[in-house]
């Protein structure tokens, strides 16, 4: 009986599963970000034609990340993936200022979706390693993120290529999943 109780204690509690939806326009860096999270090679990334799913362990959670392609023709299918989403991560190419209006419209539509109501949102202001990248504060202002009142949100500067800022964003994700699941 003593050995059995020791074995039970050694067997860690199963990680809590979390469904994360990773969205953003094409070429924002979603797949690079996902591969960075999974510690995979990021030297050969091709546009996502459908979706990628990866499970990443972090802080006692099993994060099931759904990376959905961002091309205009794929975006109408995004809503097929909304069900049971715990966290929305929206990735923006901070250096592609010509598409800020388009990415803002897409984010606004997502925030209005009933199936995503109250779902915490992390906006990754990606590609901060580029000289032309807009700072996260400027992007937050341009997207009027300060007007979001129905959920917790965060904007995080990052570079999916170098990994800078990615872990800070994922720490926020785990903290807010913890708060949501309690």
UniProtKB/Swiss-Prot annotation:
This is ADP-ribosylation factor-like protein 3. A lipid is attached at residue 2 (N-myristoyl glycine). Gene3D superfamilies: P-loop containing nucleotide triphosphate hydrolases. GTP binds at residues 24-31, 48, 67-71, 126-129, 159-161. NCBIfam families: small_GTP. Found in a complex with ARL3, RP2 and UNC119 (or UNC119B); RP2 induces hydrolysis of GTP ARL3 in the complex, leading to the release of UNC119 (or UNC119B). Interacts with RP2; interaction is direct and stimulated with the activated GTP-bound form of ARL3. Interacts with SYS1. Interacts with ARL2BP; the GTP-bound form interacts with ARL2BP. Microtubule-associated protein. Does not interact with TBCC. Interacts with RP2. Interacts with PDE6D; the interaction occurs specifically with the GTP-bound form of ARL3. The keyword Oxidoreductase does not apply. The modification Phosphoserine is found at residue 5. One of its GO terms (cellular component) is ciliary basal body. Its main location: Golgi. SUPFAM superfamilies: P-loop containing nucleoside triphosphate hydrolases. Keywords: Cell cycle, Cell division, Cell projection, Cytoplasm, Cytoskeleton, Golgi apparatus, GTP-binding, Lipoprotein, Magnesium, Membrane, Metal-binding, Myristate, Nucleotide-binding, Nucleus, Phosphoprotein, Protein transport, Transport. It holds the Pfam family Arf. It is found in: Golgi apparatus membrane; Cytoplasm, Cytoskeleton, Spindle; Nucleus; Cytoplasm, Cytoskeleton, Microtubule organizing center, Centrosome. One of its GO terms (molecular function) is magnesium ion binding. Small GTP-binding protein which cycles between an inactive GDP-bound and an active GTP-bound form, and the rate of cycling is regulated by guanine nucleotide exchange factors (GEF) and GTPase-activating proteins (GAP). Required for normal cytokinesis and cilia signaling. Requires assistance from GTPase-activating proteins (GAPs) like RP2 and PDE6D, in order to cycle between inactive GDP-bound and active GTP-bound forms. Required for targeting proteins to the cilium, including myristoylated NPHP3 and prenylated INPP5E. It is a peripheral membrane protein. Belongs to the small GTPase superfamily. Arf family. PANTHER family: ADP-RIBOSYLATION FACTOR-LIKE PROTEIN 2-RELATED. It comes from Rattus norvegicus (Rat). Mg(2+) binds at residues 31, 48. CDD domains: Arl3. Signal peptide: none annotated. GO terms for biological process: cilium assembly; Golgi to plasma membrane transport; intraciliary transport; kidney development; mitotic cytokinesis; photoreceptor cell development; post-Golgi vesicle-mediated transport; protein localization to ciliary membrane.
């Amino acid at each position: 009986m003593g050995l059995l109780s020791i074995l039970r204690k050694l067997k860690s509690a199963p990680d809590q599963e979390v469904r994360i939806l990773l969205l953003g326009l094409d070429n924002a860096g979603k797949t690079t970000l996902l591969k960075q999270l999974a510690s995979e090679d990021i030297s050969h990334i091709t546009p996502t034609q459908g979706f990628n799913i990866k499970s990443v362990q972090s802080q006692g959670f099993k994060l099931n990340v759904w990376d959905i392609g961002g091309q205009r023709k794929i975006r109408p299918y995004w809503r097929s993936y909304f069900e049971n989403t715990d966290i929305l991560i929206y990735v923006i190419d901070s250096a592609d200022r010509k598409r800020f209006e388009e990415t803002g419209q897409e984010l606004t539509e997502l925030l209005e979706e009933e199936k995503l109501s109250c779902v915490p949102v992390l906006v990754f202001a990606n590609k901060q390693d580029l000289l032309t990248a807009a700072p996260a504060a400027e992007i937050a202002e341009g997207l009027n993120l300060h007007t979001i009142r129905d959920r917790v949100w965060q904007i995080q500067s990052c570079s999916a290529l170098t990994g800078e800022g990615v872990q800070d964003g994922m720490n926020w994700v785990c903290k807010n999943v913890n708060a949501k699941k309690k």
